[in-house]
Amino acid sequence: MQQDKHPDYRPVVFRDRGAGYAFLTRSTATSDQTIVWDDGETYPVVEVEISSESHPFYTGKARTVDSEGRVARFERRYGAGEGQDTGEAG
């Protein structure tokens, strides 16, 4: 088996900037920043913008898109087939 072929897979802390939430997992991600975790060990920390603690889908604050309402508004605005040429002769 070849050495140095695969990236280093080690424990890493991911920290959500907005929610202040951090979790320890294993990853190949690298970082110069470190953090002392609850177990007293020092791990590299990777800052993320969105995690399960701040994403609207997981927090229950998701917006549902009313696609039927959008179609109805389009048809009101541009007409629902009124006066359109169907391409039939005669």
Curated annotation (Swiss-Prot):
Alphabetical UniProt keywords: Ribonucleoprotein, Ribosomal protein
Protein name from the UniProt record: Large ribosomal subunit protein bL31B-1
Organism: Streptomyces coelicolor (strain ATCC BAA-471 / A3(2) / M145)
Subunit structure: Part of the 50S ribosomal subunit.
Family statement: Belongs to the bacterial ribosomal protein bL31 family. Type B subfamily.
Domain of life: Bacteria
Annotated GO MF terms: structural constituent of ribosome
GO terms for cellular component: ribonucleoprotein complex; ribosome
UniProt xrefs under HAMAP family: Ribosomal_bL31_2
Pfam families linked: Ribosomal_L31 (PF01197)
Lineage: Bacteria, Bacillati, Actinomycetota, Actinomycetes, Kitasatosporales
Listed GO biological process terms: translation
InterPro entries registered for this protein in UniProt: Ribosomal_bL28/bL31-like_sf (IPR034704), Ribosomal_bL31 (IPR002150), Ribosomal_bL31_B (IPR027493), Ribosomal_bL31_sf (IPR042105)
